[in-house]
Regions:
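Short alpha-helix in the Rossmann-fold core of NAD(P)-dependent oxidoreductases
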Residues: 79-86, 102, 133-134, 192
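Active-site Tyr-X1-5-Lys
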Residues: 127-152
Length: 339
């Protein structure tokens, strides 16, 4: 199979391109950054460059759209990359007659759902620029489904694996330095995550699935997950300094973090702050029943494997806004002296 992977220099895109190449597929990657997978052909381009995407999509058997923006991006860039980029990719695939497309969305489309586990048909109520953009990108996807495209929509929870940094690099850094790590309130909320390897596997599954199975929308997340306190504690235990997850009074801590966010002095964005106050997990029953999805890894497995990978990397010399880079801690780099 000849497959085009957008966002192929990202954490998911690179892992997916490597996996597909190892399975014998001819993989072409496209990203604004340099190649991350030597086994795959690489094209430096922006997914919003419609003319270039049309050329790349020609002759493909499948397109997997992983390119996206993150909540840490400026608002106008989030919408442009997520919505306009998705339309550009799907337009190119449609014009080229690509028989199979996989669109990687997010469980952020549910906003802050009151029902857990959250099913795929739960109302989409975006609460910020990022979640609104993800909702609108799915609207675009449905437009192309209506035109006859076989299009899988995958909604993963936050995924972890080798290559992933972002906000998790802060937890890892504090753990390695022998610090306690704070959580809001008791930290007894259950936050479902997902192992990168499980996500790559389910994407491969929808590529091979019959059209009536593939042409659908699926939540994917870990089947086993504990409380945030317990999952974060596994990292502190692995660091071996005897440190603990410590509770912060939820009211004052939220007020401080929201103030720091408004002043652009903290990478902890608003929707994440709200998520940390309540359980957040989705139903994976549909993916299990129709795709045979059976996650191999728990939250604990995913976060520990990512931490172990991180400890083997040379110290970061800077920060950025992608999931491959540690995010700038801002004022929190000073606060950590208290822990």
């Amino acid at each position: 199979m000849k497959v085009l992977v957008t966002g192929s220099a990202g954490v998911l895109g690179a892992s997916l391109a490597a996996s597909l190449s190892a399975s014998g597929h001819e993989v072409h990657g496209v990203d604004v950054r340099a190649a991350a997978v030597p086994e795959a052909a690489h094209h430096v381009a922006d997914v919003r460059d419609t003319a270039t995407l049309r050329g790349l999509a020609a002759g493909m058997d499948a397109v997997i759209h992983t390119a996206s923006a993150l909540p840490s991006y400026p608002a106008d860039q989030i919408r442009s990359v997520v919505v306009d980029g998705t339309r550009s990719v799907l337009d190119a695939a449609h014009r080229a007659g690509v028989p199979r497309v996989v669109h990687i969305s997010s469980t952020a489309v549910y906003g802050l759902p009151r029902l857990v586990p959250t099913p795929e048909d739960y109302p989409q109520v975006p609460v910020d620029t990022y979640s609104a953009a993800k909702v609108d990108a799915e609207v675009v996807a449905r437009e192309y489904r209506a035109k006859g495209m076989c299009l899988s929509v995958i909604r993963p929870k936050t995924f972890l694996g080798p290559g992933r940094m972002g906000l998790f690099a802060m937890l890892f850094e504090w753990a390695r330095e022998g610090r306690n790590f704070p959580v809001l309130g008791r930290g007894d909320v259950r936050i479902q995550m997902l192992a990168l390897e499980d996500l790559v596997e389910v994407i491969g599954t929808v590529l091979r699935a019959e059209p009536d199975i593939a042409n659908d929308t699926y939540n994917v997340g870990a089947a086993e997950f504990a409380t945030l306190r317990e999952d974060f504690q596994t990292v502190l235990d692995a660091a071996g300094h005897g440190k603990r997850v410590v509770s912060l009074p939820i009211g004052p801590a939220l007020a401080m973090l929201r103030g720091l966010e408004r002043a652009k002095l903290s990478p902890v964005y608003g929707r994440l702050l709200s998520k940390l106050k309540a359980d957040s997990y989705v139903s994976i029953d549909k993916a299990a029943a129709r795709l045979g999805f059976a996650p191999k890894f728990s939250n604990r497995d995913a976060i520990l494997s990512t931490y172990r990978w991180w400890t083997e990397q040379p110290p970061a010399t800077g920060s950025g806004t992608s999931s491959r880079e540690p995010w700038r801690q801002g004022a929190l780099s000073l606060v950590k002296a208290l822990f």
